[in-house]
Design a protein with these regions (language model features):
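Class I S-adenosyl-L-methionine-dependent methyltransferase catalytic core
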Residues: 1-187
Length: 187
C-alpha cells in the first residue's frame, strides 16, 4: 500500500507483520463456516483467534514465529487451519497449508490478494484443494497490534476478506459479504 493511502505513514511495519485479528472478525467467520476436527493457528501472536475458537468450543493447537514455531518449517499434518498470516508471506503460507491440511483452510487476507498472474497460476488454479468461498467485509477494518475486548475496531482503508479453501469442494468459488458495520467504532 502506498504511503498516500496508509494511516501508518510514519511508522515502521510491525515485526513479522504482527496485526491482531479483532475478535468480531473471527466470530463472523465461525458464524458462517463450520470446521470438523482440530484447528491449527500457526500465527497465534497474542491469541486473539484462539480466544474465539475457545468461545465456540473448538479444539485447537497453535504456533507462532515469536516462540520458535515457524509454520513454514512445520511439517505436521492438521485437520484445519485458521489464521491471519504475515501478508508478505501469504502465498508461501497458503501453499504450505495446502500440503499439510486435510480439510479446510481459512485465511484473513487483503481482498487485493486476488489479483496477480503468479498467484493465479500457483494458488487459484488448484483443483485438489480449491478456493471455496470469499467472505468480504463490507466496512474496511483497521487492523493494529492492539485489540479491544469488545471486538470493535476503527475503520481503515484496506478491504479484508476471509478466504476459505476446502479440499472436498467441487466447482467455482463464491463470494459473500459480511456486514461488519456494528463492529466499527463510531466517532
Amino acid at each position: 500500500m502506498g504511503k498516500n493511502f496508509s494511516l501508518n505513514t510514519n511508522k515502521a511495519r510491525p515485526k513479522n507483520d504482527f496485526y491482531q485479528t479483532p475478535y468480531s472478525m473471527t466470530r463472523h467467520l465461525l458464524d458462517r463456516e463450520k470446521f470438523e476436527g482440530k484447528i491449527f493457528e500457526p500465527c497465534c501472536g497474542e491469541g486473539a483467534i484462539l480466544k474465539v475458537l475457545d468461545e465456540y468450543n473448538y479444539e485447537y493447537s497453535c504456533g507462532d514465529i515469536t516462540f520458535a514455531s515457524n509454520f513454514l518449517e512445520n511439517f505436521s499434518q492438521h485437520d484445519n487451519i485458521i489464521t491471519n498470516p504475515p501478508y508478505s508471506l501469504a502465498k508461501e503460507f497458503i501453499l504450505h497449508a495446502k500440503e499439510h491440511t486435510s480439510k479446510k483452510i481459512a485465511m484473513l487476507l487483503p481482498l487485493n490478494y486476488l489479483h496477480g498472474i503468479q498467484r493465479y497460476r500457483e494458488v487459484w488454479l488448484d483443483t485438489e484443494f480449491p478456493l471455496k468461498k470469499i467472505y468480504v467485509f463490507c466496512r474496511y477494518p483497521m487492523l493494529s497490534n492492539e485489540i479491544r475486548e469488545d471486538g470493535k475496531y476503527g475503520s481503515g482503508m484496506m478491504v479484508y476478506a476471509w478466504f476459505i479453501w476446502d479440499r472436498d469442494h467441487k466447482g467455482s468459488a463464491t463470494i459473500d459479504w459480511i456486514d461488519n458495520s456494528d463492529d466499527i467504532i463510531k466517532k
